[in-house]
Each structure stands twice: as C-alpha cells, then as structure tokens.
Design a protein with these regions (language model features):
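NAD(P)H-binding glycine-rich loop region in Rossmannoid oxidoreductase-like domains
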Residues: 66-105, 113-116, 133
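Active-site Tyr-X1-5-Lys
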Residues: 151-182
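N-terminal Rossmann NAD(P)H-binding glycine-rich loop of SDR-like oxidoreductase domains
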Residues: 11-39
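Rossmann-fold cofactor-recognition segment
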Residues: 57-68
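Conserved Rossmann-fold NAD(P)-dependent oxidoreductase catalytic core, especially the SDR/UDP-sugar
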Residues: 109-155, 179
Length: 186
C-alpha cells in the first residue's frame, strides 16, 4: 500500500506524485513540464494533440485529443494526483465550432475525468482578459468581478466559458482543490 509520498527517481521508496499537464507541447507547457520534471517528487504525463520533440526522457507524452477515450484512460488507469490544464487551442485556421468543441468540450471532459477518478487537485489556466476591458472597470478588479469579455470580443467566448466551467466545478466538486489562474500581462 502506498503512503502517498512521491518516489525519488530510480528509487523503490514511496510513490511519486503523478501530474498530468494538458498543452504540454506548447511554450508554457514545456516550461511547466521542465520545472516540475526537475523535482524528484513528481512524475509528469502530458496530453497534447501536438508532438513534443525534445521532451525529457522520463516525461510521458500522449499525443491525443483531450475528448478521446485515450485521454480518459490516462486518468482511469493510473492514480493522477493533479491536473494542470493549459490545453486550449488558439488555431486561427480552425472553425468556431472546432475551437468550441476542443476548448469547451475538452475542458468539460477533463473535469468529468477528475471527478470520476478522484483527482485531488486541478489547476485551470484562464486569463485576466476574461473580465473584459471596459471603461467603467475599476483600476483593480477583484475575483468577484463579472467575466464580460465575451460581450464585446466573440473570440473570448470559449475562454470565458472554460472559466465558468472551472468555477462551477470548484463549487460542485468541493473535495477537489480547484485553482483558476488568471494571469495578466504587463
């Protein structure tokens, strides 16, 4: 029986924490994967539709669609300790329907997998842009501010909906520690 403690690389000690990163082949995904990879407490698995050339040798990469059975199997067949979801498609060649299906449908499936397979921690990357730039906004917005970007910027609709899905998940799956990151650029 596992104590839940991570296994050091090459050791027979306690189990390493499995962190699944979506969007691992993207710029930010690579940075996060490499940072966590250097910590011997973590085992990194990535889900991305794109290949991940140059990945560290002990990082497992699944080149799959987030909505697929193969993606679900990553959660079903192995104890996942955390999900870092950064797998949002920004392909200008994709149709609105394709983007919606991938982004919103994929996020919905991932949250479903986390609830079904008892993933204790979920981090969803959003953006401060979901608040929408409005002249009546105060200088500093709180997390309680409404997400109004989709009203003026249709391209933001998927990201706003993903944020809403994660917020709803936060309240529905109270036993899962859920974090929504809304970084802002300077």
């Amino acid at each position: 029986m596992s104590s839940g403690e991570p296994v050091p690389r090459g050791g027979d000690g306690p189990r390493r924490k499995k962190v699944v990163i979506t969007g691992i082949a993207g710029r930010l995904g690579r940075v996060v994967a490499r940072a966590l990879h250097h910590d011997p407490r973590f085992l990194i698995e990535g889900l991305d539709r794109r290949p991940f050339p140059g990945k560290p040798k002990d990082v497992i990469h699944h080149q799959v669609d987030l909505r697929s059975k193969k993606a679900r199997d990553v959660f079903r067949t192995g104890e996942v300790d955390a999900l870092i979801h950064m797998g949002v498609m920004h392909d200008p060649r994709a149709t609105t329907a394709e983007l919606y299906s991938w982004n919103v449908g994929g996020t919905s499936k991932l949250l479903e997998y986390c609830a079904t397979y008892n993933v204790p921690k979920v981090v969803v990357l959003s953006s401060a842009n979901v608040y929408g730039p409005r002249p009546e906004n105060p200088q500093f917005l709180t997390e309680e501010a409404p997400l109004l970007a989709a009203q003026r910027f249709p391209a933001m609709r998927d990201l706003v909906e993903i944020d809403h899905l994660a917020s709803t998940f936060f309240w529905k799956a109270r036993d899962i520690e859920t974090v929504i990151l809304r970084p802002v650029s300077r």
